[in-house]
Design a protein with these regions (language model features):
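N-terminal pre-triad scaffold of radical SAM enzymes
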Residues: 1-14, 32-41
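Iron-sulfur cluster-binding cysteine motifs and their immediate structural context
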Residues: 14-34, 44-60
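Conserved dinucleotide-binding and phosphotransfer motif residues
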Residues: 22, 52, 106-107, 245
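Conserved beta-strand termini and adjacent loop/short-helix elements that scaffold enzyme active sites
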Residues: 57, 205-207, 252-254
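Conserved AdoMet/S-adenosylmethionine-binding subsite of the radical SAM
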Residues: 64-217
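Short glycine/proline- and charge-enriched loop/turn segments
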Residues: 216-225
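Short, flexible active-site recognition loops that position polar ligands and cofactors
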Residues: 224-234
Length: 255
């Protein structure tokens, strides 16, 4: 992805001059613009920018390149460490994940898959054969509301959850958003889902706004203004509901 950081830009015009698609307008008389539909992501503008106002977010890796990074850090993993692949959704690059996990296990490196469970079941089953732990993101239990907030049904997710929890140790990761999935009804439903699938631990991940700046860099409007941050007493109430079902519940990474 192409980031634009306005506070670093000097409007020198170097990026506009090298853009083969004419997708950049950097004239002082008007706001700096990137036509992202016109941009073909050649990234020549990034190379031309002397002030790092234009940057590439993310890197492309082959399996060999990524394994070199993983092997380089192997001395830090110790007995219980290893590699976690998350996303986005790792199952959207499932063949890549499968190859990395195979090579990790061949070297005795622990593997963790952080997934929503939304992906091809056959490929998921292959990946699970080389997975030590799954962090299963459960966004919402209600199928209608799940589709409203995520754009997809949770039917496939629930199907794959059966496969995951019957195959590999699993923890549920709950990204918690006020007004979306933090109501008691959904928390109770999530707890029942966990118990029914033999899951013992819930990681509660409250919404934060640390990623708001990234939307700005991408020329997009941040959605975070629509949602408030949950207060500690509210979070404690959520944890207590999970505890009442005999589940371990703690606050994991902030989402």
């Amino acid at each position: 992805m192409l980031y634009y950081m306005a506070n670093r830009c000097r409007r020198c015009g170097a990026c506009e001059a090298v853009c083969p698609q004419k997708a950049i307008s950097s004239q002082y008389a008007s706001p700096f613009r990137i036509n992202r539909k016109q941009c073909d992501r050649c990234m020549l503008c990034v190379d031309a920018c002397l002030y790092n106002a234009l940057q590439i977010s993310g890197e492309w890796y082959t399996t060999d390149q990524l394994m070199k990074v993983i092997e380089r850090d192997k001395c830090f993993y110790g007995k219980d460490g290893g590699v976690t692949i998350s996303g986005g959704e790792p199952l959207s690059n499932g063949e890549f994940v499968l190859e990395i996990f195979k090579r990790c296990k061949a070297q005795g490196i622990g593997t963790v898959l952080d997934t929503t469970g939304y992906g091809d079941s056959g490929l998921l089953e292959k990946i699970l054969a080389y997975t030590d732990l799954v962090l299963l993101d459960i966004k919402h239990m209600d199928p209608v509301l799940h589709k409203k907030w995520t754009g997809v049904s949770n039917e496939l997710i629930h199907k794959n959850a059966e496969l995951i929890t019957s195959t590999v140790e699993t923890r549920i990761s709950l990204p918690l958003v006020a007004g979306v999935n933090a109501d008691p009804e959904n928390i109770h439903a999530t707890a029942k889902f966990a118990v029914a699938h033999g899951v013992k631990h819930i990681d509660i991940n409250p919404l934060h706004t640390l990623g708001a700046g990234k939307y700005h860099y991408l020329g997009k409007r941040s959605p975070y203004g629509r949602f408030r941050t949950l207060e500690k007493p509210e979070l404690d109430e959520v944890a207590e509901i999970f505890h009442s079902y005999g589940l371990q519940a703690g606050f994991g990474r902030m989402m």
